[in-house]
Amino acid sequence: MTDTPETLSGTECNGDRPPENGQQPSSQTRQETTDADETQAYYKVEPSLEDLPAKENQEETGNTKGNILPKGPEDEKILNENPEENLFVVHQAIKDLSLQEISAEDMAFREGHPWKKIPPNSSNLEVSRQKERTAQQQLEQRGDASTTEIEWLGFQKSRPVDILHSKCDEEEEEEEEVWNEEINEEDVDECAEEEDEVRVIEFKRKHREGSPLKEESLAREDSPLGSPGSQPGTPDEQPVFGKKGDIARNSYSRYNTISYRKIRKGNTKQRIDEFESMMHL
């Protein structure tokens, strides 16, 4: 009966009535402790990361565990009497702590700092690495299959470096073609100019060579035809022709000479006489 006044003093301080009908004070104190723990667990507000850093979270966990642990001989007796209820209380407190941590992580994720505040687990890292390796292996296998198909068909993939080289080669070939065309045109022009120069030179040479021959022919033709009544030379001096056709040809050629053209400018009678004299030669 020594424990009853202590329990009564506690209940009187809380404003409750004293126990009636001979109820045991231990049951009341046990119910009060369970109610207090439950109300404390569900009455807590979800904290934010800005207001509650990691140290405060650790202090809260220590305080809750301290509240669960027995403080005096009365609490030790209560724990010894009902161990199942005590285990339930402990599990409930652990659940509350886990819920608080989850809510804090959700707040951090909403604020935009999920990867800084929540470090990844080793198992998650291994899984992610395995996924990356499998993806790389699949890509390599696809690349190898495509290369084998291309080699089987006899083609090769066009790399960017090959494309650049091909473009440069095409540009160089186009420049060479343009250059060759220009050179060919210049060569043709030069050849034409050289041919023209050669023709001019040959024409000049022929003109120079033909001028003394014409002068000699003119001098020979002018000598017997100096006067209209002049007679032809002696038969000894006249050339001997074998046939009449040769005479006609010779006369025709002499008819077309410059001297005869000059003679044609005179009177008709003079021209007739000259022509007859030429035909009788």
Curated annotation (Swiss-Prot):
Modified residues (Phosphothreonine): T234
Keywords associated with the record: Actin-binding, Cytoplasm, Cytoskeleton, Phosphoprotein
Listed GO CC annotations: cell cortex; cytoskeleton; filopodium; glial cell projection; internode region of axon; myelin sheath; neuronal cell body; paranode region of axon
Gene Ontology molecular function: actin filament binding
SUPFAM superfamilies registered for this protein in UniProt: Moesin tail domain
Tissues with expression: Brain and spinal cord. Exclusively expressed by the oligodendrocytes. Appears at a late stage during myelination, and in the mature nerves, it is localized to the outer cytoplasmic lip of the myelin sheath and the paranodal loops.
Basic and acidic residues: compositionally biased ranges: 198-223
Cellular compartment(s): Cytoplasm, Cytoskeleton
Region Disordered, annotated ranges: 1-80, 110-147, 167-248
UniProt record, GO biological process: actin filament organization; morphogenesis of a branching structure; regulation of cell projection organization; regulation of cell shape
Acidic residues bias spans: 169-197
Compositional bias of kind Polar residues: 1-12, 21-31, 135-147
Top-level taxon in the UniProt lineage: Eukaryota
Keyword Phosphoprotein set for record: yes
Modified residues (Phosphoserine): S211, S223, S227, S230
Annotated spans, Binds actin: 262-281
Gene3D superfamilies: 6.10.360.10
PANTHER family: ERMIN (PTHR47137:SF1)
Stated role: Plays a role in cytoskeletal rearrangements during the late wrapping and/or compaction phases of myelinogenesis as well as in maintenance and stability of myelin sheath in the adult. May play an important role in late-stage oligodendroglia maturation, myelin/Ranvier node formation during CNS development, and in the maintenance and plasticity of related structures in the mature CNS.
Subunit and partners: Binds actin.
Protein name, as recorded: Ermin
